[in-house]
């Protein structure tokens, strides 16, 4: 019998193409902050505890969000290296996030949505990036990828950095494109290990799947420049903001709870699939063919306002598990990596409001 050709790997272990889309490498978005601020980040020892838990769950690929602003990413890589040294069979890989933001992000100003402008203060300049922050994030990503080439398998340039509802910090695609091209040039010159894929992780609309305001020449060039596309989809949030798919139909009201809720969650999954497909459709219109993975989606277990019992009633542990199980089954079958948001609850997300949904996606 003919044997399949062997996979030729470098000393750095499996390649991104062997990991992404492979259900043997389950993915998760990760933040290990225990407290109500990020000032006191987790220690390497605490991160070792976390990755042992995640590994026991079958998670082998983590996504982070910053490189230079906080020490967590570098400590996480050190924690993984320690585990690998102690147990050579231990596997955990990382998609390293580099935070990208506009010039004057987080400035004190008031946004006038009707006129699409800031009415006081300097406000962010969305046409330019924060050069100091962004260059530090990217150059630190290069350093970490080179220091941990057996662990870092991808670099994501920006997190929801192009979606225009991120009014305090978003940039236009040309800024993301600049840094993606910078990383690709670094790979070509040997300044960055070649065994790392480059992407940007953003809302499905930012990747052309919705509002045509995003359909620009710069976005087309970005599609061409990345090694794969990382898409975000959040039916949970749209259960309140765009609830056409959400809720129990009159014909379902008499059904048992599990069946009734299951049908509701099936529609949430269909909604997520539709957003994913919209990106594929737009990319196809451009004549571009790249792998598309889900860089972020999730479901909160608690909310005291819009998504809780007085709102869309989406937030609870039962629906969280139902969403996770259904979406994970589909992505495994389709060969799509799913970075589920997120591994653990993080109190710093909205420290002044303990019941806010952002604190309860873990």
Regions found by a protein language model. Name each.
Residues 3-5:
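N-terminal Sec signal peptide cleavage junction
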Residues 12, 74-196, 294:
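Substrate-binding cleft of extracellular glycoside hydrolase catalytic domains
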Residues 13-109, 131-138:
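N-terminal carbohydrate-binding/catalytic regions of secreted carbohydrate-active enzymes
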Residues 7-19, 23, 305-362:
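Aromatic-rich peripheral "rim/lid" segments of glycoside hydrolase catalytic domains that contact
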Residues 129-133, 153, 162-294, 300-304:
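Noncatalytic carbohydrate-binding groove/subsite architecture in carbohydrate-active enzymes
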Residues 26-30, 60-64, 90-98, 153-157, ...:
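Hydrophobic faces of well-ordered beta-strands that scaffold small-molecule active sites
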Residues 35-41, 59-65, 97-103, 120-132, ...:
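The substrate-binding groove and active-site-proximal loops of carbohydrate-active enzymes
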Residues 10-15, 49, 75-78, 136-143, ...:
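Alpha-helical scaffolding within the catalytic cores
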């Amino acid at each position: 019998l003919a044997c399949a050709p062997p996979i030729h790997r470098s000393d750095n272990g499996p390649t991104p193409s062997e990991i992404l889309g492979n259900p043997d490498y389950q993915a998760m978005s990760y933040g290990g902050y225990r407290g109500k601020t990020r000032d006191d980040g987790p220690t390497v020892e605490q991160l070792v505890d976390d990755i042992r838990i995640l590994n026991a769950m079958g998670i082998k690929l983590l996504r982070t969000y910053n490189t230079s602003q906080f020490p967590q990413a570098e400590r996480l890589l050190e924690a993984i290296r320690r585990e690998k040294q102690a147990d050579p069979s231990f596997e955990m890989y990382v998609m390293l996030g580099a935070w990208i933001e506009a010039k004057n992000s987080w400035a004190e100003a008031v946004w006038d949505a009707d006129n699409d402008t800031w009415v006081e203060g300097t406000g962010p300049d969305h046409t330019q990036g924060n050069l100091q922050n962004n260059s530090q994030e990217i150059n630190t990503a290069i350093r970490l990828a080179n220091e941990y080439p057996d662990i870092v398998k991808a670099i994501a340039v920006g997190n929801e950095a192009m979606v225009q509802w991120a009014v305090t910090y978003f940039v236009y695609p040309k800024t993301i494109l600049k840094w993606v091209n910078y990383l690709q040039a670094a790979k070509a010159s040997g300044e960055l290990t070649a065994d790392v894929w480059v992407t940007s992780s953003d809302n499905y609309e930012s990747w052309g799947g919705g509002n045509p305001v995003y359909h620009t020449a710069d976005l087309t060039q970005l599609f061409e420049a990345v090694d794969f596309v990382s898409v975000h989809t959040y039916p949970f949030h749209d259960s309140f903001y765009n609830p056409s798919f959400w809720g129990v139909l009159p014909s379902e009201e008499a059904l048992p709870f599990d069946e009734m809720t299951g049908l509701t969650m099936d529609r949430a999954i269909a909604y997520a699939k539709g957003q994913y497909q919209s990106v594929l459709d737009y990319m196809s219109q451009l004549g571009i063919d790249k792998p598309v993975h889900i860089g972020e989606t999730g479901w909160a277990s608690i909310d005291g306002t819009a998504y809780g019992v007085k709102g869309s009633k989406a937030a609870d542990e039962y629906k969280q598990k139902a969403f996770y199980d259904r979406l994970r089954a589909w992505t495994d079958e389709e060969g799509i990596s799913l970075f589920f948001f997120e591994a653990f609850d993080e109190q710093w997300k909205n420290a002044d409001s303990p019941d806010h949904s952002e604190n309860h996606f873990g």
